[in-house]
Curated annotation (Swiss-Prot):
Annotated Gene Ontology cellular component terms: cytoplasm
InterPro entries for this protein: AA_adenyl_dom, ACP-like_sf, AMP-bd_C_sf, AMP-binding_CS, AMP-dep_synth/lig_dom, ANL_N_sf, CAT-like_dom_sf, Condensatn
GO molecular function annotation: ligase activity; phosphopantetheine binding
Species the sequence originates in: Yersinia enterocolitica serotype O:8 / biotype 1B (strain NCTC 13174 / 8081)
II-DR repeats: 1495-1527, 1682-1693, 1750-1762, 1826-1834, 1849-1863
Lineage of producing organism: Bacteria, Pseudomonadati, Pseudomonadota, Gammaproteobacteria, Enterobacterales
Region (II) location: 1466-1919
Domain comment (free text): Consists of a central region with similarity to the repeat domains of ACVS and GRC2, flanked by two repeat domains, each of which contains 5 direct repeats.
Keywords, alphabetical: Ligase, Multifunctional enzyme, Phosphopantetheine, Phosphoprotein, Repeat
Gene Ontology BP terms: amino acid activation for nonribosomal peptide biosynthetic process; toxin biosynthetic process
Protein name (Swiss-Prot/TrEMBL): High-molecular-weight protein 2
Positions of post-translational O-(pantetheine 4'-phosphoryl)serine modification: S52, S1439, S1977
Domain of life the protein comes from: Bacteria
Gene name linked to the record: irp2
Family: Belongs to the ATP-dependent AMP-binding enzyme family.
Region described as I: spans on this chain: 3-547
Amino acid sequence: MISGAPSKDSLLPDNRHAADYQQLRERLIQELNLTPQQLHDESNLIQAGLDSIRLMRWLHWFRKNGYRLTLRELYAAPTLAAWNQLMLSRSPENAEEETLPDESSWPNMTESTPFPLTPVQHAYLTGRMPGQTLGGVGCHLYQEFEGHCLTASQLEQAITTLLQRHPMLHIAFRPDGQQVWLPQPYWNGVTVHDLRHNDAESRQAYLDALRQRLSHRLLRVEIGETFDFQLTLLPDNRHRLHVNIDLLIMDASSFTLFFDELNALLAGESLSAIDTRYDFRSYLLHQQKINQPLRDDARAYWLAKASTLPPAPVLPLVCEPATLREVRNTRRRMIVPATRWHAFSNRAGEYGVTPTMALATCFSAVLARWGGLTRLLLNITLFDRQPLHPAVGAMLADFTNILLLDTACDGDTVSNLARKNQLTFTEDWEHRHWSGVELLRELKRQQRYPHGAPVVFTSNLGRSLYSSRAESPLGEPEWGISQTPQVWIDHLAFEHHGEVWLQWDSNDALFPPALVETLFDAYCQLINQLCDDESAWQKPFADMMPASQRAIRERVNATGAPIPEGLLHEGIFRIALQQPQALAVTDMRYQWNYHELTDYARRCAGRLVECGVQPGDNVAITMSKGAGQLVAVLAVLLAGAVYVPVSLDQPAARREKIYADASVRLVLICQHDASAGSDDIPVLAWQQAIEAEPIVNPVVRAPTQPAYIIYTSGSTGTPKGVVISHRGALNTCCDINTRYQVGPHDRVLALSALHFDLSVYDIFGVLRAGGALVMVMENQRRDPHAWCELIQRHQVTLWNSVPALFDMLLTWCEGFADATPENLRAVMLSGDWIGLDLPARYRAFRPQGQFIAMGGATEASIWSNACEIHDVPAHWRSIPYGFPLTNQRYRVVDERGRDCPDWVSGELWIGGIGVAEGYFNDSLRSEQQFLTLPDERWYRTGDLGCYWPDGTIEFLGRRDKQVKVGGYRIELGEIESALSQLAGVKQATVLAIGEKEKTLAAYVVPQSEAFCVTDHRNPALPKAWHTLAGTLPCCAISPEISAEQVADFLQHRLLKLKPGHTAGADPIPLMNSLAIQPRWQAVVERWLAFLVTQRRLKPAAEGYQVCAGEEREDEHPHFSGHDLTLSQILRGARNELSLLNDAQWSPESLAFNHPASAPYIQELATICQQLAQRLQRPVRLLEVGTRTGRAAESLLAQLNAGQIEYVGLEQSQEMLLSARQRLASWPGARLSPWNADTLAAHAHSGDIIWLNNALHRLLPEDPGLLATLQQLAVPGALLYVMEFRQLTPSALLSTLLLTNGQPEALLHNSADWAALFSAAAFNCQHSDEVAGLQRFLVQCPDRQVRRDPRQLQAALAGRLPGWMVPQRIVFLDALPLTANGKIDYQALKRRHTPKAENQAEADLPQGDIEKQVAALWQQLLSTGNVTRETDFFQQGGDSLLATRLTGQLHQAGYEAQLSDLFNHPRLADFAATLRKIDVPVEQPFVHSPEERYQPFALTDVQQAYLVGRQPGFTLGGVGSHFFVEFEIADLDLTRLETVWNRLIARHDMLRAVVLDGQQQVLEQTPPWVIPTHTLHTPEEALRVREKLAHQVLNPEVWPVFDLQVGYVDGMPARLWLCLDNLLLDGLSMQILLAELEHGYRYPQQLLPPLPVTFRDYLQQPSLQSPNPDSLAWWQAQLDDIPPAPALPLRCLPQEVETPRFARLNGALDSTRWHRLKKRAADAHLTPSAVLLSVWSTVLSAWSAQPEFTLNLTLFDRRPLHPQINQILGDFTSLMLLSWHPGESWLHSAQSLQQRLSQNLNHRDVSAIRVMRQLAQRQNVPAVPMPVVFTSALGFEQDNFLARRNLLKPVWGISQTPQVWLDHQVYESEGELRFNWDFVAALFPAGQVERQFEQYCALLNRMAEDESSWQLPLAALVPPVKHAGQCAERPPRVCPEHSQPHIAADESTVSLICDAFREVVGESVTPAENFFEAGATSLNLVQLHVLLQRHEFSTLTLLDLFTHPSPVALADYLAGVATVEKTKRPRPVRRRQRRI
């Protein structure tokens, strides 16, 4: 202040006001650059140049001076006179002092103290993460400046100055969501690119590449890299400056300051000093304190307003933003010259509108026009720099806030719209203190704004963005770009040298081509129009649709042509004269030529006339499908009447309603249809009618008169009749015949019902052309097998149906290799969505066939558009409508009747001569749907569509309550009307749910107990639950953390109270000294009171004086770091909610660690065990409020899968995610969100409801919770409730902060709880308490009433046809309403999102078969309630689970084929394929404990493993070996050794050896002492690994495993585990590792002994021999099995001495894996089939022949015992699977899956046996199949080799004899993980690595790009040239192969036969194959040993496999002997082949 001047407080009010007004006037003159004479009291300040930003600054000035004005008031009257009146009306007495706050009040940034982000900064930081939608970019500006003479040293010096001046340039952004100041900023100086001497071409290329690299740069803000300057030096002293700035550190308003200061420094000027005592951290703390009350008000304001907000801009997209992997933005710029801008802003000011709001209104209007909206939610950027301190004005920081503005875009003049928006803005701006970021988060939580508000408007008018200087040393801004995460289009307006720059930065990849360009052009035209035409402000916005688009519409709709003459039926009678003997129609009963058909029709017409039918009468046809329908139709038309087809398949009452509405004169029926008659209307059977005399003179009608009336569903409950003229229908039929050359050679399969208008073309189109109808009977309408027979028998050439039926045909034919579709030359589909896959699938049968997609409406004569499809482009999202048919037209219209621009969705209108006459006898509905405009008569379809730029029409679905379901058009209103008439329905509404294939869902509010059934308690549930509990286990009652330890922590660590110190009765000074925020006062007072009780402080009356005492040293380890956490919370630097995630201090952890928690959980486990025995099934336990699942994990660890099915329900999505991760390894655990849909899905299912410290927390939020729990429980269920009676000391340091210091208000004693239970009709049977933790056993009521949807469906079926009865019925207490009281349909639809779809109440399985299937699906798929609509594969099923399912169904007495499940994956459809069979009396599982330690036979696979490891075999000399290396921190070797020995004792096969060709379990083995290695370097560890990884374990000596440990200096311990597949298969290894992990983690929890052994399993009679049918099936396949992949090899396999395996491994992250499985399910493929097909695609590209066979490893455990999946053993079987490439990848994959399902049906025949048969068939020694696929998917071991385990996998390898390449796949931690183990020496260097890269790339592509599934294989992986198997090297010829044939003597043959009998125990004839005679591979090993003893010393094991019969072997031995005698060469090392 000036010395001597009076302070404001000393001025009298009048003088005070006068001084303020004078200051206002002077500052306005200066700011607006006016003279005093130019500024009048009535001058419009906005017109004078006052913009939005300056207005906000003036508002701050007014408030700082004590005038409580609002922004709305300043905008309302922007003149000095009006503002003066406002000042006079407000008292200025409460003006704020201009004094600076105390420096210590607002702390500065320091290196050690991070501080919070603003909401916008937080959004930027999280949004930039790569996993976020449109993430992977920062909020980033890249700008180039072009100038002269700037040097790097000048620039660097200036930036260094700014670094010292602005602390925000030192900021780094931490992963925990905070920012921190770095004393040394991250800046490496200016990077210089010297291009002064480059030629022009290379210089430009360099600059382009530099721009490409820098323009979308993601700066490393986490280390403080927030800006960067690079300088390019150019010739002639020119330069280009490249600037990168992350907007986390500065907003656009700070740019001006930044560049101004930088330019000043470069110009040699000095900068004024700034106040360093107050920085951005100070500002944020200051702002938080001042704004807190305003923030609460603002939050309430926005939450109240939220439900009324309009949608965000709805622009056409080509892809979902979440699928876009990279963000690359494009800039568009319009520069408005100063003079034109002056005109624009001046005119805006005249209407009291700022230029900013005028621009925002124009921008919104363009968005609205292309989004079909009248209002939208615009994301407006605010530069919300509050002048809290003088230092703020010169501060560089991000002050950004966002405001979501409800913007009016249409329906008024431009000026009025802008004023309305400005008024809304001023009101919203006053409530900006609850940021738009937070509002958006709330809106997303409500699932209303899935993309947020992705279109942003930013205005920086009134200042330059880059510098306010006229001359800038930096240069002029030229090319630039910005990015903001999650933003689609970002609009920026700013001034530059008097001009205004309007820029759009957009992510064009999201939008259709040229769309953004079109929008920007429209925006520029609006701005130019408002600049040029003053009157435009007083008019609505001019239409923005481009003229070029209108011209294209006119062209494609120019369809006029001559109109066909005559009546609809006349052409058929002309054909009858021309070709009377030609076939006209055939069905199962009749086959008529044209003469017969027309004769019958004439006779029937004659009888109609006799019955009194007059011209124009309506005659109903109600009969089942057949040739008689044609007679009836033609007869009615000949009689001059109108035919009215009325379906027989609907309730009689509805038929009668149609008859009455249509004034039907007579009903034509079929005499076989007993129920077709009418009570009130005459009926006539066509069979009787054709006995009459034919009509003599057919009645002639005008072509414009009606031909037929088709009734469709009506919204009022009454069906509506569409009246179609002869001319309209005839035009369509003739057009289609001409377009597709339909003629006498054609036959059509007439599938459509007569009341479906596709039948009109079948009859009048095909017969008019001389073709014939092949009619299906009523029972064949859904039977593709019958269709194929009819198509083949009658040579059908045309197909005309809804898409679903054609899909059914293709699926059938693909599955059964039926080539029937090749007969169809033309396929016409319409009536519903057409799958993108259908054209290619059809052309796989007939490449040159015509595939025609058509559309239209019954109201427009069958069809109105057609599109012939050749190839389906990858970018298509659906099959389009195409173009209008002849004499027909289309419009796409918005709500105001305007044509929609290209790509914009609107209602489809149809015009032309096909438009119906209207609805019969319903003028009101006719007027609503049929519009007569000056140009044309139009039918409003209610369909949504859009135009493409070339004039193609795309169909997008329905907009009203009329839907298409299964091809039927249904008015939802008719269903709602029928529902409302049912007794017991209070209110109801109906929706069609699903994206394309719709399903009807009814939401019903029932009355009283309507549609109810009563359930009673299961007698197996106990009446007294405490009888199951037993005695509560003993426990220590001392808490983990004592009160004394808590007191120590509070006194010394947190409050820092020293002995003798007096805190004072008022805690505020203490809080101030510790910088504790005022809101924590209640908490601090509670702590002080606690310290008094602990005798650490004296009472408050004595000032809380600290008592004498010393700090204890035995601090609990959980306190480590907790003081820092609490200090940050108390100071406001951290949110207290972070405690919820604290591993030690969350309320959940504190409750879990309470000493009574473990005994209670153990008691609950005991109850579950006892109850499971009583129920003879797993107990269904639902935990409500599961949190992160800590207690659940402890419970599940004490139970097995046969005892519990656990469902955890949790409100918090974050905690739900944590719980899913924690419980991922428990197959019986499922987790769901706590919401209405989940509750409905689990209704009446829980045997036990568990509430662990949750009831007190949930009850206040939901007072009806106890009633809800009743709905979850079965009658008589147990509520197991655990609740604290009082707060524990440790909770003072956690829970207290989360409950506002008053947690006890939520806690109750046992009497209070018992009263609550009793009031809710529960019976509290028992209670207990230990150390303050209470436990209640509460019984639910024994009787419960529930709603039964089937009752309602049955009632509806009496009023509606079957296709109109909703498949889903959802009972609700009330329908949800919007803010304006209407039904909230969006809320209802959200119940059926894909996530909620599985949880919604739906059509329950019906009948015993469906229920049996449903029960098995629930068990196998680990899912909740399945419905009749549930799809096995979409629910997670795969081929493995499918195989298990068929086996279990067989045990239940049903014949089930895998192929049926693949073809019919919907539950109801699959159940219909099952056939009841007589199952032999099931043999009980034989357990032979007395034979447990006796030898038993090896399986075929075990024998192959054993024989194959012999050193002489090709690729032998290795074991079937699995090796894995783990690292483990803080290894407890004793514990590990104990656990391993327990597992040895538990599992017999860990004690097994192989002796004399048999396996045997040892009864006793010595304790395993784990060998240890002390190692000093990682290299030593690697040497140990290498030695162990490739060892061959001796199966004859125990142990046949190896487990060793290595200690490496400074590293975690290493654990090496070797297992042999000879004794353990892959699943056994998963079980073993899971039990090892669990045992080591929980050593006190012992696993129970197993009641069954592997030996028992193998001895079961059902496993002893393969099914004869399977043997025959494989025998029939032998000639069609191709060889193994012919891959390029480095050498022949037999040349590899000892194979050495190498590994490649990879993974598909959980997101992509989930997406890939979802795509697989949608394509009805299992995940394994997809992976096999991807792998085969790669192999096929490298193989010499594209077809080949793979060897599949199956872990084939037959479900012979409930605990079969807990035992170890080698259950492996092998199965061959062939790959045959098809037209596309998808087709190939589907074919592979079809073969897979067939092969699995016959998997009881091993691949080993099949390969032997192949060898015999091909007369070769062996047919190897050395390329192996091993899938462990579906085994629910998500913890297998998981990195989260204590045993963390580091490295692994497997090896198998005779295998070249083994691809293994498994799931772990939500990911797909896979390995390739291969013989390294076998393949050229780098080849397998290249194949692996291709596989990984293709796998990712399949997950990301759905269109790639349709591509040919060569487009995915190009074939490799010269791929072949050692093609350049001739095979070696061994001497034995070239020896002469010498016959053996009979004695040798006899000797071999005798030896065989001795070894095998069976006889063999001389010429009989050893294997066919009963030998195994192991027998041949034994035979080899025996024959060597008989003087055949040169005989090798391979010789027996090469010459596998006595005579062949004897012949060979004779030849060898001869050669030995004559040549006596040096012995040749024999090469062995794989068996």
